[in-house]
Amino acid sequence: MKTYKIAVDGPAASGKSSTSDLVARKLGFSHLISGNLYRAVTYGLVRRFGEVRPGDEEQKRFVLELSIEVRNNRVFLDGEDVSESLRKEVVDRHVVSVAREKYIREKVFTIQRSVIDLEKRGIVVDGRDIATRIMPNADLKVFLTASPETRARRRYMEGGSESYEELLESIKKRDHNDRTREHDPLVATCDSIVIENDSMTLEETADEIIRLFRRVESFN
C-alpha cells in the first residue's frame, strides 16, 4: 500500500499546525509538527543552561547527545514528556536562534525522516522547509499564508500579554528571519500550491487541502 505524504509549509501564525492536524484526522493520517522538535531542543537548552548561546561548544555537545522522541505528537526529551512546556514564553524567545543552527537542523532532520519513514498509511508534516528539504517527494505540497495583519490578529485573539501591535511587529520580524536565514529559508517551491487563507476558516482551509489531496490520490 502506498504511503501518502502531504507537506504543509508557511510562515508564523498561518495556521499550519491546526490545519494539518485537522487534515490528518479527517484522512486518518499521522501528523508531525516539525516546530515542536525545535521547541524541544530550545526547552532542553534553557532548562539545562538557563540561556541559549549560539555557537557554544558545550551546548552543541549537549544537543547532539540529547535523545528526542516523538510519539503521537508528544515530544520526549531523554524519556521525559515535555510537550506541555514547549509553548513557554522563554521557548518562544529563543526558538528562532536555535532553528538557525545548522547542526540542530541536521539533528531535527534525522528525527523527522525517521518518523516519516516509519509511517505506513499516510502523514501530514508541517513546518517551514518540508517541501524544500524534508519531503521533496511529497505527493502534495501546500504553502499556507496570510497577511501579517491577519496573522497578528489571530495570535491576538488567542490571548496573552502582547498587544496587537507587538504581535504584528514580532511576526514581521519572524518572517524576515525565516526568509533570509542561511540554512533552509522559508520559500514556496515551484510545485507547491499556495493557499492564502485570510478569509478562510480553519475548516475551509483543511477541506481545500483534502480536496487537492483527493485529486492527487485519484491519479495513484
UniProtKB/Swiss-Prot annotation:
Instruction: Provide the binding site for ATP.
Output: G10, P11, A12, A13, S14, G15, K16, S17, S18
What's the EC number here? 2.7.4.25
Gene Ontology molecular functions: ATP binding; CMP kinase activity; dCMP kinase activity
Which controlled-vocabulary keywords does the entry list? ATP-binding, Kinase, Nucleotide-binding, Transferase
Q: Does the keyword Nucleotide-binding apply?
A: yes
Q: Which family does it belong to?
A: Belongs to the cytidylate kinase family. Type 1 subfamily.
Record's protein name? Probable cytidylate kinase
